[in-house]
Amino acid sequence: MSRVKAGVVGVGKMGEYHVGVLAELQKVDLAGIVESNEKRGKSIAQRYEVPIFTDYRELFGKVDVVSIAVPTAQHYAVAMDFLNSGIHVLLEKPCTNNLKDAQELFKVAEKKNLTLHIGHVERFNGAVQELFKIVTEPIFVECTRMSPFTDRIKGDGVVLDVMIHDIDIVLNLIKSKVVKTNVLSSTVFSERDDLVVAQLQFENNCIANILASRASQNKVRTLEVTQKDSYVVLDYTDQEIYIHRQSSSEHQLSKGALRYKQESLIERIFVHKDNPLKLELQHFIDCVKNGSPRKVAVDSELYSLQIALDILDQIKKQKK
């Protein structure tokens, strides 16, 4: 396979990002896009000079790979049709809205020797890649992901929309099974979960606190890790990572007053600022063309979804 023919199904905000990156990748030909919104589809097609279709089945026989960025409720049916047609699939997160459908998709992909990649783009953030080199024995992990409300995502609440990014990173960072989950949630601007705090306790005694909100007036995306010998702070947006280490501390008696003095060392880690989506699509294409191994195992993909769904189940039970 000298050149890869690619298509994109669903060119909303995320889908358009895929179109833009695929159009620039070497040895990739953008063969077509699919969009049900005629006005939106024509606009993207003209901008990138690519054929447009209204039925995704029209891409069968025209593409080797496809990026699917449709609403989550449509993921299973659309992805399954492409896999059954022998086409490699990059499916935007979350994989599906239930575990059984996700398992079936991976089984079909394996049976047909096809690549099924789930779009967890934060894995390809340069700061996250450095984080996995630094963190070895986490004690406590705290994630904060806040942004203003937008009606861009109408089908999913904040758990499947954005919290799943942090769930995925946390599980792969801690590398232990979740034994207990506590969840608090609130609906603010929609009928679904707009603000969720999930506390996860792991088999190895590590604890994670994950906050996801689309009810904030500012945008914050950070992850902090406490280890015995360091405190690591990661900023997803700026792609920066800092390591704090305590160098000394002492109590001082001055004029009858007891004062505490602490000195810390702060190390800023060099992080490449490459486009995470570009790196993700390059990895996907490499898996397809060269048979390169996936960076994340199927079991890990499914476990991230399982924990996200467990959190949603707790939210539903609390509302009854």
Whereabouts are the PLM-identified features?
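N-terminal Rossmann-like dinucleotide-binding module
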Residues: 1-48
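Contiguous beta-strand/loop segments that form the cofactor/metal-binding neighborhood of enzyme cores
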Residues: 167-240, 271, 276-292
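Beta-loop-alpha module in the N-terminal Rossmann-like domain of NAD(P)-dependent dehydrogenases
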Residues: 18, 48-106
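Hydrophobic residues in well-ordered beta-strands that form the structural core
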Residues: 54, 91-92, 116-118, 142, ...
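A short helix->loop->beta-strand "cap" motif at the edges of active sites that frequently abuts
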Residues: 50, 85-87, 112-115, 206
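Mid-domain beta-loop-alpha active-site segment that forms a flexible
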Residues: 119-126, 149-178, 300
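A contiguous active-site-proximal alpha/beta segment in oxidoreductase catalytic domains
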Residues: 96-153
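C-terminal helix-rich "cap/oligomerization" subdomain common to oxidoreductases
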Residues: 65-68, 203, 283-320
